[in-house]
Amino acid sequence: MAVLCIALGIVGLVGGGLIAPRRALSAALSNFSLLAGIAQAGVIFAAILFVTGARWDGPLRQMGLRFGTFLPAALGLFALLALAGSRWAGAVEHGRWPAAGVLVRDGAILTLLLGLSRSFDRSLAQSPHRGSGSGRRARVLAPLLLIAYAYGWSWLAFDLLMGLAPEFVSTLFGAFVFIGNLYGALAALALTAALLARAPAGAALAPPQRLHDLGKLLFAFCLLWTYLLFSQILPIWYGNLPHETGYLVDRMTAPWSVWGWIMMLAGFGLPFVLLLGRAGKRRPALLASASVSVLFALWLERSLMVAPALSGAPPWGWIELSVALGSAGAFTLCVGRGPSRSPDPLTDGPM
């Protein structure tokens, strides 16, 4: 199934590049930013668990590290995106596609994060104990990785997403994007855990208490993501900054406004209602529903960041759908079969 989705994605990207290059470029960039961000955030989540000395996580640390198996593919996709974008950017208004030097810098950032992630994964695979030699190396690498992620993805957000609308400036935009990545990684982990809980072989790996812990984290990031979103809008209003309203007006009026409301409902409203009570965090079906809703909302979020600036106007059609399916298929294939150095949570059991 993943291979079929990848084939559809290639058809959509190549066909879209020939028929509607703006739409193909928009779809490729939005899906890249989301899935590369989730893959990196999975490793970051494992690093946070290691730095804090968490003992409740069970196999979640290994699951997060396995997300990192998509990072080499993401780097390759970025290289293709940079080359194709430079060709297709002729169809985009001048100044709305990053310059070559900016793309080189972004590629260097992705390469650095990939190197740190693989080194951290290797250190944990050699010895997960903090007091051993490899564990001490991981204690050094983990904080460096966290700092590099915060700075690196802030730059990537500024260059690849906010830079598409030069009239809009937000110093909070980078934090909003890298927190959104963590929100998506938690949703993907929660979805995986919920699916494991419904399988006889995986029920021991995802007991109700572990689902409850994941649900609480997902609920907290639901509130944080919404807070950061509102925090970027509020200063424009109370600071009376009319020159920055164009970015918001484009996304709050037809034809984009309906998608913005759907994004808020899927990213805040539905998860808030489902995860507010104890039952929603412990029942696999409810937790999985909230997780899928969050992932869909983040896909809409990245699309709304990119599409109004590059593709012009909706409706979204077969190009966007096929590229999204292809990207999801590539992510699933890498995570499911990728050569991660971390133990396989499905075969090594609970930590």
Regions found by a protein language model. Give the residues of each.
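N-terminal regions that are enriched for targeting/export leaders
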Residues: M1-A39, V43, F331-M351
